[in-house]
C-alpha cells in the first residue's frame, strides 16, 4: 500500500517529510494517518543525524486543504468525534514537542486541519503565489478547529485576530499572513523548499511579537481586557447568527478557557465542543450542502453529453444584470465578452460596473492595476451586431418583453453560427415561448442569474422540451466557469426559485395587510434564519418586478399565486423600492445606516399596524408555503431531485443553511407534521395552504426525502 508520508534525508542533516495522498488531487487529513505520522516521528526522534525537519506537500497547488469531511459521518456518537479530535491533539503535540526545528513549507491551500498541522510546527514559510491561502473555515460547516487550532492560533496571532479568522472562516493571503505573524516568511515558490531548509538549519526561533494596536495590547494583556473582547465577540455572534448556529459561541468558549486555564484545559474543551458540534443537526445540514455542491461539480447537467468549449461570449443588454454577467464572464471565467446595447450610455454603464468591481480588488491589494486593466481589455462593446459572429454563447439580459426577445433570437440566428447558444436571463417568461421564434430551438436555453450577479452564487439553467443535451452541458460548464453553482431546471412559469419565493412573499404581504408591522415581519424571518426579511427583499428586488411576475404565475399555476392587493396600491403611489428611493423603507442621504420604515406606507395600504403576533408563528406561516411549493416543483419535474431543490433555495434566496434546505427541513419537521400545519392554516385562510398530494402520501406512508 502506498504511503501518504515519505521521509527523505539530506546530507546537511535536514529531513524532508513530503505529504502526498495517493490518488487525490489535493491533500486532506484522514483518521488513518495518525499511526503513520506517529511512526515517522518516532523514527525521527531515534535518528541523531537529523538536525531539522521540513514539512512540504507533494501536490501541485495544495499544502493540506483540510480534514477529510467524510470521516465525520463515520462518527456515530459524540464519543467517536471526541476521540478523533483527541487523536489529532496527540499527533500535533508530538510534532510540536520535537527537540529539532520543524518548519512547514506552504504552497497552495492550507486550510482547516492543514493550518492546524502548520501551527504545530515551530516556523512557517509560504509561497507568494495567489493560490496560497491560509484559514480555518470549519465554522462554515458548523464546526470548530478540532486539531488544536483554537489554542495555537490565538497564542500566535493574538486573540482578536484569531477570533476573527475562526468566527468568519475567512481565508488569508500570504502577505497578510506575514503581517499578522501567522507565517515567518513569504518567498517565491521556486525557493520555498530552500528557504524552509535554511530556516531549519538556523534552529528554533521564537516567533516575532505580533504588532498590536495600543488598544489591543491593553485588552489582550489583562484578564479584564480579555473578558471585554470575549463579551463583545459573543454579542456580535448572537446578533449575526440569531442563535441559529452553535459553533461560534463554542469557538469563543474554547479560546476563553484555554487562555484562562492553560493549553491542556483548552484542548480538552476543544475536543468536547468539537464532538458536540459534529453530531449537531446544524452541522449535519451544513455538511450535506458541502457534499451536495461537491457532487454537483462533477455533473454535466445532461447525462452523456460533452460540453462545447466557450471561447467567446456576447451579452445583449448593458443594464445592471447585463453588466454583472459581463463582469463575472471576464473576471472569473477569463472569457472575452462583447456587450451589445442600443445605447452608448448602457455600454458605458456596463464597463463602469465591471471596472468598479475590479478596482475594489486593486484597492484591497488583491490584484495589480495591470491585472485589472488586462481583464477589462477582455470586454468590448458595440451598438450593432458587429464582432458577434464567432460567439459560442449569447446571454440575453433585456426587458421582459416576449416580442423583443423573439426579435433577438432571429437576429442572433442570422448573425451567428449554427452552434451558437441563445441563453435568456428571463425571470418569468417560459423558455419554450422564447424558442418559438427560433429555427434552431435546440440552441435556446434559459440562464437565470440572481441580483447582484457578482454576489449571488446560483444560476438556474432552464431547459425546454427541445433544448439539446449538448446545449445544457455547455451552458452548465459556462456558468461554473463564472464561479456559479448551476442547477438544471425544466421550463415552467417562475422556474423553481421564483416560484417558491412568490408564495412566501405573497404570504408576508398578506400578513402586512392583516396589520403586522413591516419591521416585526422582517425581524421574524431574519430570526428564523433568512439573511433579510421578505419586505426588505421586496424593496431590493423591486415592487414593480414582483407585481409583474405574479399575474404570470397566477395564469400558469392557479389562484394560489394571486398576489394580495398591496402591490397595486404601492405602484399607484409610485413605490418601486430601493431603485427609485421609495418603498417600505426610507432611502436617500437622510436615511440612517439602520433603515427606518417609511411610516407613510401604512396609509397607502389603508392599514394601521396592530398588535404584533408571535414571531415564530409569522415565520412558520410564510415558510410552510415555500416548503409545500418546493415539493410541488419536484412533483412537476421542475427540479430533478430534493438535493437540487435544497441547493437552489439556499444559494438563490438564502433559505437558512443550518436547516439544510426546504427538503432537509421537511424531513426534520416530518411530512405528517407539515401536513397537519398546512391543513390547520387551510381551515383558517383558505385553499392556498392545501398540502400537495406527495406530502399527503409521504405523511401516510411515513417516508422522508433523504
Swiss-Prot record:
SUPFAM superfamilies: 6-phosphogluconate dehydrogenase C-terminal domain-like (SSF48179), ClpP/crotonase (SSF52096), NAD(P)-binding Rossmann-fold domains (SSF51735)
Any one GO MF annotation of this record: long-chain-3-hydroxyacyl-CoA dehydrogenase activity
Signal peptide: none
GO cellular component labels: cytoplasm
EC number: 4.2.1.17, 5.1.2.3, 1.1.1.35
Record-linked HAMAP family: FadJ
Protein name (database record): Fatty acid oxidation complex subunit alpha
Species per Swiss-Prot/TrEMBL record: Shewanella sp. (strain W3-18-1)
Amino acid at each position: 500500500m502506498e504511503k501518504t508520508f515519505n521521509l527523505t534525508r539530506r546530507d546537511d542533516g535536514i529531513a524532508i517529510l513530503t505529504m502526498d495522498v495517493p490518488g487525490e488531487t489535493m491533500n486532506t487529513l484522514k483518521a488513518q494517518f495518525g499511526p503513520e505520522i506517529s511512526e515517522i516521528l518516532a523514527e525521527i526522534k531515534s535518528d541523531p543525524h537529523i538536525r531539522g525537519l521540513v514539512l512540504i506537500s507533494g501536490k501541485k497547488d495544495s499544502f493540506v486543504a483540510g480534514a477529510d469531511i467524510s470521516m465525520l459521518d463515520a462518527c456515530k456518537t459524540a464519543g467517536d468525534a471526541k476521540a478523533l479530535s483527541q487523536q489529532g491533539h496527540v499527533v500535533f503535540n508530538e510534532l510540536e514537542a520535537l527537540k529539532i526545528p520543524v518548519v512547514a513549507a506552504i504552497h497552495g491551500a492550507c486550510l482547516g486541519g492543514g493550518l492546524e498541522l502548520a501551527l504545530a510546527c515551530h516556523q512557517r514559510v509560504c509561497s507568494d503565489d495567489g493560490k496560497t491561502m491560509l484559514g480555518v473555515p470549519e465554522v462554515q460547516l458548523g464546526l470548530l478547529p478540532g486539531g488544536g487550532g483554537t489554542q495555537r492560533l490565538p497564542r500566535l496571532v493574538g486573540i482578536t485576530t484569531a477570533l476573527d479568522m475562526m468566527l468568519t472562516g475567512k481565508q488569508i493571503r500570504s502577505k497578510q499572513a506575514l503581517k499578522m505573524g501567522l507565517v515567518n516568511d513569504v518567498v517565491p515558490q521556486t525557493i520555498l523548499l530552500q528557504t524552509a531548509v535554511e530556516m531549519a538549519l538556523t534552529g528554533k526561533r521564537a516567533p516575532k511579537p505580533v504588532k498590536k494596536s495600543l488598544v489591543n495590547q491593553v485588552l489582550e494583556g489583562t484578564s479584564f481586557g480579555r473578558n471585554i473582547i470575549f463579551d463583545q465577540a459573543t454579542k456580535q455572534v448572537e446578533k449575526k447568527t440569531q442563535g441559529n448556529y452553535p459553533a461560534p459561541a463554542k469557538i469563543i468558549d474554547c479560546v476563553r478557557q484555554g487562555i484562562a486555564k492553560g493549553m491542556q484545559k483548552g484542548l480538552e474543551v476543544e475536543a468536547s465542543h468539537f464532538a458536540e458540534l459534529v453530531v449537531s443537526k446544524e452541522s449535519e445540514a451544513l455538511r450535506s450542502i458541502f457534499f451536495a455542491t461537491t457532487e454537483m461539480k462533477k455533473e454535466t447537467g445532461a447525462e452523456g453529453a460533452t460540453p462545447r468549449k466557450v471561447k467567446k461570449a456576447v451579452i445583449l443588454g448593458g443594464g445592471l444584470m447585463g453588466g454583472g454577467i459581463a463582469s463575472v464572464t471576464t473576471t472569473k471565467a477569463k472569457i472575452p465578452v462583447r456587450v451589445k446595447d442600443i445605447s452608448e450610455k448602457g455600454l458605458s454603464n456596463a464597463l463602469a460596473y465591471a471596472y468598479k468591481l475590479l478596482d475594489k480588488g486593486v484597492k484591497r491589494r488583491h490584484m495589480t492595476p495591470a491585472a485589472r486593466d488586462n481583464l477589462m481589455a477582455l470586454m468590448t462593446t458595440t451598438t450593432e451586431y458587429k464582432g458577434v459572429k464567432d460567439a459560442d454563447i449569447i446571454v440575453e439580459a433585456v426587458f421582459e418583453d416576449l416580442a423583443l426577445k423573439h426579435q433577438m433570437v432571429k437576429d442572433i440566428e442570422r448573425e451567428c453560427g449554427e452552434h451558437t447558444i441563445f441563453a435568456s436571463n428571463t425571470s418569468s417568461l417560459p423558455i419554450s415561448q422564447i424558442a418559438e421564434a427560433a429555427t434552431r430551438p435546440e440552441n435556446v436555453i434559459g440562464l437565470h442569474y440572481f441580483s447582484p450577479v457578482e454576489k449571488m452564487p446560483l444560476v438556474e439553467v432552464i431547459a425546454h422540451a427541445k433544448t439539446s443535451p449538448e446545449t445544457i452541458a455547455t451552458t452548465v460548464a459556462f456558468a461554473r466557469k463564472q464561479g456559479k453553482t448551476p442547477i438544471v431546471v425544466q421550463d415552467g412559469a417562475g422556474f423553481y426559485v421564483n416560484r417558491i419565493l412568490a408564495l412566501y412573499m405573497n404570504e408576508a404581504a398578506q400578513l402586512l395587510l392583516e396589520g403586522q408591522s413591516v419591521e416585526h415581519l422582517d425581524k421574524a424571518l431574519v430570526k428564523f434564519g433568512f439573511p433579510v426579511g421578505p419586505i426588505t427583499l421586496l424593496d431590493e428586488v423591486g415592487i414593480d418586478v414582483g407585481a409583474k411576475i405574479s399575474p404570470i404565475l397566477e395564469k400558469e399555476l392557479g389562484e394560489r399565486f394571486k398576489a394580495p392587493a398591496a402591490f397595486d396600491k404601492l405602484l399607484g403611489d409610485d413605490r418601486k423600492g430601493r431603485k427609485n428611493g421609495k418603498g417600505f423603507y426610507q432611502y436617500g442621504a437622510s436615511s440612517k445606516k439602520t433603515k427606518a420604515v417609511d411610516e407613510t406606507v401604512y396609509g397607502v395600504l389603508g392599514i394601521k399596524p396592530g398588535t404584533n403576533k408571535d414571531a415564530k408563528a409569522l415565520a412558520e406561516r410564510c415558510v410552510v408555503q415555500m416548503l409545500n411549493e418546493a415539493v410541488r416543483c419536484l412533483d412537476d419535474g421542475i427540479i430533478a431531485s430534493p438535493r437540487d431543490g435544497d441547493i437552489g433555495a439556499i444559494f438563490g434566496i438564502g433559505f437558512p443553511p443550518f436547516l439544510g434546505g426546504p427538503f432537509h427541513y421537511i424531513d426534520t419537521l416530518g411530512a405528517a407534521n407539515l401536513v397537519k400545519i398546512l391543513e390547520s392554516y387551510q381551515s383558517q385562510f383558505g385553499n392556498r395552504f392545501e398540502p400537495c398530494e406527495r406530502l399527503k402520501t409521504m405523511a401516510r406512508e411515513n417516508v422522508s426525502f433523504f
